[in-house]
Amino acid sequence: MDVRALPPGYTEWPAPPVLRDAVACLWAQVTSESGSRTGLVLPDGCTDLVWEQGRGAFVAGPDTGPVATTMAAGTVVLGVRFRPSAGGPALGIPLSELRDQRADLAELRPAQARQLAAALDPDVAAAQMLDATAALVADGAPDPAVTWAARLLRDPAARAEDVAAEVGLSLRQLRRRCQAVVGYGPKTLQRVLRFRGFISRVDARPEILDLAAIAAEAGYADQAHLTRECGRLSGMTPATLARQRAA
C-alpha cells in the first residue's frame, strides 16, 4: 500500500494472508494539508497498534464507549486492528489493563517501539508496522477458545453459559479468558458486536433509515433497547449516529 497516495479520509485494506488469523484489517487516516480533523472512535471489540506521524507508536485498548480524536492538518495515522482474540496474546498482557486506555508501545514492547520510533516516513512506518505485528503475533498467537467464542457471540441470542460450554470452558473460565484476551467479558463483547452489527446495517442502507426494522435485524429487543445501547456505546441516538455516518 502506497500510503502517500491515499486520499484524505479513512481507508481500510486486508492484512497479508500470513497475518489474517490475528489481524482484522490494516487502516490509515489521512488529513489534508489544509485542514485538521476531529472524529469519534466507537467500540468494536478490537485492540489496535497505531503509528501517528509526529508521535510514534501506541496501543489503543478495547473501548467501552466513544473516544474523541483530533488530527492536525497534513497528518497520517496508520493502524493494525487485531481481532478480538489476538490483542492480548500478541501484546503479552491482560487486555483488561488497557480497557478504555491508550498506552505507548514502549511501555509494552520496547523492541518493536524502538523500531517504529525511527520511522518518519509513513510508507516506511507502514512496512515496519507489518514487521512489528509479525513479531508480536509470533510471540503470542490468538486464543483458539476465545476466537471460537467471539464467533458464537456474534449471534445476539447466544447465551454466555451456552457459549462457554460449546468452547469447552466453564462460564467463569470464559470470563477470565475474555478479560485477559479481549479486555472485557463475553457479555460486554456480545453487546459491542451487536452494536457493530447495527452500524454495518446502517452503512449498507444509508438511504433507508427504518430504525425499528434495523433494531430487530441486529438483535435488539426493540427500538428503545437500541436507543439505550447506542447512547451507552456512542453517546448518540441511533438517528444521529446514522446521519453522521451518512454525511
Regions inferred by a protein language model and the residue ranges of each:
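Alpha-helical bundle regulatory/interaction domains
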Residues: M1-L171, V181-P186, S200-A221, T237-A247
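DNA major-groove recognition helix of helix-turn-helix
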Residues: C178, Q190, E229-G231, A242
